[in-house]
Amino acid sequence: MLDLSNFFLTRPLANRFREVVSGSKDGAPKWAYQMLEGNDEGYFGPESAVWEVHGCVSTIIGGIRALLLQAAHPAALAGVAEHSRYESDPLGRLAGTTKWLTITSFGATEVIEKEARRVNEMHSKVIGNYQAKDGQAHNYAAQDPEYLMWVHCAFTDAFLQTYIQLGYKFKTDRKSTRLNSSHIPLSRMPSSA
């Protein structure tokens, strides 16, 4: 893989990108200090496929793929269209998703559970209805396990496939299987931010 980290244009672009994604001028938002809390490796740990894949730059491209796949579900699309700040504050929305993904991937269990409570509280208000292709009206709620599973599977598939398609290799042959089987019980799963 080509290393562009020392290319003269890379540093300012990287700095700006960190600011955009994190929501902080220095690329280190206040919430990042939560990552120092807790005394365990969270749900996954440093040897997991989650740490390997989510710690890779391919996650940025995978995130775009995930958003497109998530939007293919009419309930997810309606929820975002009616309740998200993606139009009025797209960078803030991106920073919120970055916070959620970082904490749930790399944080200690108590930090993940705190983030889950925050996001689940926010998403408890995300309810509404949408019209399906057949003209039928359907209700949705962001905390519905079916929709949560759709969103989480879209993230998993998008991050994993992008990682593989960009030519990254797992340190062991069994990691892709572990990524697919790594899960958080739905009762404790934080909604996607």
Spans of model-derived segments:
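Mature, function-bearing regions of proteins
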Residues: M1-R178, S182, A193
